[in-house]
């Protein structure tokens, strides 16, 4: 347990008027605060209805007091919670009275959670789960954040780390005892253990990607030539008319963004200017911005006017566009105006690209497209949600995976035990960054400073 010098105080409930306002105090001088504000130290883990007074015994409010003794508290320190009336003036008066006591100061953003982390009450991924639960914008995201808070993500990472430690011991034993008759590097046990870790890490990576989408949303860019129906599709997905729609090519000249949820799954839908040569200066700027969005998208909805072509292969339709796309960006072909061509509103696969036939104007086939977007995001319906993940988690997993695969090369091609051991060590180091078992002070400061004050 890390011993704190300061005792900190902050309002734990949101600022503003409310029926109840909660003030949280944590640190070594909590009992001194209780004696001043309450006139006594409350009974441990027992709700007492008391008056809240200042140092001059003037009553400021009355409510419930809860006292938790270290280490049995959220922060692992002595903690006092005062639950009073939620008016901003009352809260401010009470906090000022508490701050007038020696060794008290206002808490920094996320400092209560940081102290909980430092005192091993929760790991870094769980601490981030608190912030993600508070900031969740959908039911699915809230459930996933709760699973992270409850340690589901951390447990998977710890299982991987334990497997790595066991494998490292075996590899390093083969290095330290070369005189043994058994060739540890060739007996199959190391390769079997390594392949199992590679498979398990890939499974966790897939879940983490879904968790990151739940937290940050999936960026879907609608792109195509002018007058293909891009703005009509945006309006249909959003459910209201956000974009101006006309028969004039080039009506959309700038990027338009809308944030929507499809069954709790967050999407950032981006409508872009029609891509063409020979546009005027204003439209050219819009096209440049469109390409900026396209290259950073998670998914491209490639819009076609079905009345102008029967082709479905995007490379056949517009090879230059496909060549400019980053390989990491997924593509879905959308044949719009199928109501005019008589095509069935359906989906087929063509050269690894799904093709959807819709009418953005009438909305026919759009529900099928929505189901497609949900599937891409890993929608799980009413089944148990996965865990929440952040971009730093994905980066750590990517780095760990890179070193793990390099270790596989060292084992299979070179039988280099020392280099394999080093790659396993680096893999473990990156995975341990996720839970905070191995993290720099700069990283911790950046993470906790993004939390709410009082958390």
Curated annotation (Swiss-Prot):
Its main location: cytoplasm. GO terms for molecular function: GTP binding; GTPase activity; metal ion binding. GO terms for biological process: tRNA methylation; tRNA wobble uridine modification. Residues 217-378 form the TrmE-type G domain. K(+) binds at residues 227, 246, 248, 251. InterPro entries: G_TrmE, GTP-bd, GTP-bd_TrmE_N, GTPase_MnmE, MnmE_dom2, MnmE_helical, P-loop_NTPase, Small_GTP-bd. One of its GO terms (cellular component) is cytosol. Signal peptide: none annotated. It comes from the Bacteria. GTP binds at residues 227-232, 246-252, 271-274, 336-339. PANTHER family: TRNA MODIFICATION GTPASE GTPBP3 (PTHR42714), TRNA MODIFICATION GTPASE GTPBP3, MITOCHONDRIAL (PTHR42714:SF2). Homodimer. Heterotetramer of two MnmE and two MnmG subunits. Belongs to the TRAFAC class TrmE-Era-EngA-EngB-Septin-like GTPase superfamily. TrmE GTPase family. This is tRNA modification GTPase MnmE. The lineage of its organism: Bacteria, Pseudomonadati, Pseudomonadota, Gammaproteobacteria, Alteromonadales. The gene is mnmE.
